[in-house]
């Protein structure tokens, strides 16, 4: 059971590592764009399209803003992956043990070390196995949520970025 719990926790760490790397890359790329004169080029393109006031320029602006919004939404989803959201009360309705002896938040609720140690010593091996099984279940739900957000965030970010770059290239050609 401990091996299964460790495996699920490793998947959670894997997802967090992937997202951290992707967000770091996005940050570096955004820094490069902001530090160079690309911002002025984008501004010139959008100013030109706003002044043009044609159907094609309106479509261009709508697609550009939607793609940028999609990119930002994807980054938001990726950031959400990194925030812990373990609420034991959320899982009590699913039949999961609420007063865990191995979940850090439940351990911290013990007023003293000796109180926690006493609970641990009174715990039978069957109770400990049930606790581990509960933690496997909870961590699996957390892992599933993280990978779902990761996948959606990655797709939204990539699609938004690619479409935005295509629109910027089209805009640069039209100016």
Where are the predicted features?
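Solvent-exposed, non-transmembrane helices and loops of integral membrane proteins
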Residues: 88-137
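Generic alpha-helical secondary structure signal
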Residues: 77, 108, 120, 141, ...
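Alpha-helical transmembrane segments and their immediate juxtamembrane boundary regions
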Residues: 6, 10-88, 147-175
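Cytosolic juxtamembrane N-terminal segments of multi-pass membrane proteins
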Residues: 1-11, 137-143
